[in-house]
């Protein structure tokens, strides 16, 4: 029989296989024909008629119609991501030994093993760093020689804005952004994805709720449809936030990436847990969480901004997508806590973007120059609502062309 397979990214291909074979045999054939990197057997989930196919069951048992298709969903293995923080800590050892003899030489050598530790290897905090490295020597010792060879190209972006390094830096940031947003869909792609998932037998309302709870991540949305939306995310999937709340927090989004850029290097070296855990304590991240929960379509723009200001953070997000989405899905603090966090974000934004806050977290007023007001008016003249225009304009760092492109890509046929 010939099985038609379709990915959530709209890729379609066919596999010839005996119906007596098991589902696992089909997965192995997909891996052999499409590549182990893109379709590993362990990461494949095959879905037909709204059900996940069991590995040990024969294909004929599912009565697959050759005119229909089987959805193939690939999840990334978690073993790859868990090794990253270990190698990052381990590779700090050679940089700290260099510091003790010559601080000047450390500046040239430290970035090569690990960009995350380069800013903190020169100050007097090298002793704790070396202690951390020596506490976990054995597991990653074999991989240490390979890591320095892979990362030097990204290091100049973090440590030096020299013009000669702009080309590799831009390309690396672009690749990181593509990795971080590869699983997300917006605009017309969103509508196509809704239709695609509905063809699996689900109602439109169910699909939209699942996509909302997963921040438009189609892989996760299908999992929610199959397994059920977790209880802590159901209210977020069903309840639509008031438009005022969206426009209230969004102008502070540039401060989110800027604050993260100034804190990431020092925090990741001292954190003993997950590389992204330090974000929980950042008021700016709490505001970002509120913004994204209210308007998930802004996530790609915010990731792009983070990629420009802090490629290292974007790399961590790309390597730990599931954990990052989980953190974004966590409930936002109550009104009192939000008010305090809003004040901190407003202060940070006031220095760089001219954002001023009025009241106790209920309304934020934005100070704009006449030129910025004209740009906002021009975007409104394209036919977009003022609230969405302000969101896009500030999320795109006041870049009028980028904001216009962002707005044109969005789907405004929602509630």
From Swiss-Prot:
Record SMART domains: STI1, UBA, UBQ
Extent of Low complexity compositional bias: 84-143
GO CC field: cytoplasm; cytosol; nucleoplasm; nucleus; proteasome complex; XPC complex
Top-level taxon: Eukaryota
Principal location: nucleus
Coiled-coil annotated residue ranges, if any: none
Family of the protein in this entry: Belongs to the RAD23 family.
Subunit structure: Component of the XPC complex composed of XPC, RAD23B and CETN2. Interacts with NGLY1 and PSMC1. Interacts with ATXN3. Interacts with AMFR. Interacts with VCP; the interaction is indirect and mediated by NGLY1.
Task of the protein: Multiubiquitin chain receptor involved in modulation of proteasomal degradation. Binds to polyubiquitin chains. Proposed to be capable to bind simultaneously to the 26S proteasome and to polyubiquitinated substrates and to deliver ubiquitinated proteins to the proteasome. May play a role in endoplasmic reticulum-associated degradation (ERAD) of misfolded glycoproteins by association with PNGase and delivering deglycosylated proteins to the proteasome. Involved in global genome nucleotide excision repair (GG-NER) by acting as component of the XPC complex. Cooperatively with Cetn2 appears to stabilize Xpc. May protect Xpc from proteasomal degradation.
This protein's name: UV excision repair protein RAD23 homolog B
Gene: Rad23b
